[in-house]
């Protein structure tokens, strides 16, 4: 009894929207790439290109450091 998962086509959101640089101040955009528990969702799940995944990771870490985003979920 193998569980079948819904497969959606993966595409890089940043390439599709024409975003050149990921900004740490765009908290609404960054929240889409963070799981409920506060972890960064990997590129193999989101479909983000490697270049943008690196920028995304750095931007999320900067936003966390500046207290724009939480490190973990709400306890």
Curated annotation (Swiss-Prot):
Gene3D superfamilies per the UniProt record, alphabetical: Ribosomal protein S18
Record GO cellular component, one term: cytosolic small ribosomal subunit
UniProt-listed SUPFAM superfamilies: Ribosomal protein S18 (SSF46911)
Keyword entries, A-Z: Ribonucleoprotein, Ribosomal protein, RNA-binding, rRNA-binding
InterPro entries according to UniProt: Ribosomal_bS18 (IPR001648), Ribosomal_bS18_sf (IPR036870)
GO molecular function, one term: structural constituent of ribosome
Biological processes, Gene Ontology terms: translation
Pfam families noted in UniProt: Ribosomal_S18
Reported function: Binds as a heterodimer with protein bS6 to the central domain of the 16S rRNA, where it helps stabilize the platform of the 30S subunit.
Family, as annotated: Belongs to the bacterial ribosomal protein bS18 family.
Assembly and oligomerization: Part of the 30S ribosomal subunit. Forms a tight heterodimer with protein bS6.
Name recorded for this polypeptide: Small ribosomal subunit protein bS18
Organism listed in the record: Laribacter hongkongensis (strain HLHK9)
């Amino acid at each position: 009894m193998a569980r079948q998962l819904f497969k959606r086509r993966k595409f890089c959101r940043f390439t599709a929207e024409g975003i050149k640089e990921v900004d740490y101040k765009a908290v609404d955009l960054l929240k889409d790439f963070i799981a409920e528990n506060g972890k960064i969702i990997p590129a193999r799940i989101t479909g983000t290109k490697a270049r943008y995944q690196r920028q995304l990771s750095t931007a999320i870490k900067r936003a966390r450091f500046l207290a724009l985003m939480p490190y973990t979920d709400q306890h």
